[in-house]
């Protein structure tokens, strides 16, 4: 298989990954707005997909640069590494989707890419310093989402304390459309940029680009793929995210989405690739805990956290195994 054919395969698989990312993470964008019955599932996925795409015209490419050249030394990257890394990430996403686990597509990509790079060139392939912030934010992003959600919940509770519950419910049913749009913007910019990073790395490795600058067509294609995946949805995970962790009202849904949006947009601004899944889960737990700790179904939360911990090493193992298996096929 020649280099150009491999490049085309990598681009196709990256867009497939972005589609699966939107499909897998659709639940994060719309679980709260569906579970509170503000929108039907069909309208919710259209709403989220639209704002996923609009994010292409709002934010930069700092996260793409972190993924593409900040975690693996770009000079050792070739099409085989990228191909195996993508297949590892897609395989992990598929396994966790079948199991109904809301794991992180972002961390699956990081793990698959890193595992394939190590299989190719050893641990010297990794930019060790580039892994510090993403790994640190595995733990920090849900904590930040949790704290911001508690703060938003407490603040908005104080603002509406003198109004009748039915009136407050009507207000927040409308406001949840805004918060869901903001969250989908944050989801779109943070997650679509990861695919941009991989495609741009492939273009550099294949000699199509002289410097690491993300082409505009790559930005548009990644956002279109993610929007399409979001429209396809991931309904089993929606149930876990929307109701099994804690029961949400429109007021709580607004607080969770607003907290998630603020966290995702802030980290995207600083080029930190975080997990939308981790962020919104932390925010939903924060909403429940602001009422009382017993409102959170901690058994479900522990199962989700366990899946998070396994994502990077699990996807890395798949990426490494697939790289070794593919040596004879793509010489």
Regions found by a protein language model. Name each.
Residues 1-331:
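Multi-pass alpha-helical transmembrane bundle typical of ion/small-solute transporters
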């Amino acid at each position: 298989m020649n280099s150009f054919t491999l490049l085309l395969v990598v681009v196709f698989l990256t867009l497939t990954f972005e589609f699966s990312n939107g499909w897998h993470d659709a639940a994060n964008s719309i679980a709260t707005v569906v579970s509170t019955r503000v929108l039907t599932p069909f309208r919710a996925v259209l709403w989220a997909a639209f704002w996923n795409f609009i994010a292409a015209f709002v934010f930069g490419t700092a996260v793409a640069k972190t993924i593409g050249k900040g975690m693996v030394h770009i000079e050792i990257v070739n099409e085989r590494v990228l191909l195996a890394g993508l297949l590892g990430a897609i395989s992990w996403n598929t396994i966790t989707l079948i199991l109904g686990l809301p794991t992180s597509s972002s961390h699956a990509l990081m793990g698959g890419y890193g595992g394939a790079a190590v299989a190719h060139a050893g641990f010297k392939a990794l930019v060790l310093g580039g892994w510090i912030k993403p790994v640190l934010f595995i733990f920090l992003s849900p904590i930040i989402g949790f704290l911001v959600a508690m703060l938003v919940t407490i603040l908005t509770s104080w603002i509406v304390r003198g109004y009748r519950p039915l009136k407050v419910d009507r207000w927040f049913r409308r406001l949840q459309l805004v918060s869901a749009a903001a969250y989908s913007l944050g989801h779109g910019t943070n997650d679509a940029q990861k695919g941009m990073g991989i495609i741009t790395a492939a273009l550099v490795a294949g000699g199509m680009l002289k410097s690491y600058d993300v082409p505009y067509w790559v930005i548009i294609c990644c956002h279109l793929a993610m929007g399409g995946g979001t429209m396809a949805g991931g309904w089993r995970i929606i149930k876990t995210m929307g109701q099994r962790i804690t029961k949400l009202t429109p007021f709580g849904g607004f607080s969770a989405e607003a907290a998630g949006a603020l966290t995702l947009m802030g980290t995207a601004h600083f080029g930190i690739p975080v997990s939308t899944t981790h962020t919104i889960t932390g925010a939903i737990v924060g909403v429940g805990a602001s009422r009382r700790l017993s409102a959170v179904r901690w058994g479900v939360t522990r199962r989700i956290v366990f899946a998070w911990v396994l994502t990077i090493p699990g996807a890395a193992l798949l990426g490494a195994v697939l790289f070794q298996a593919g040596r004879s096929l793509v010489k």
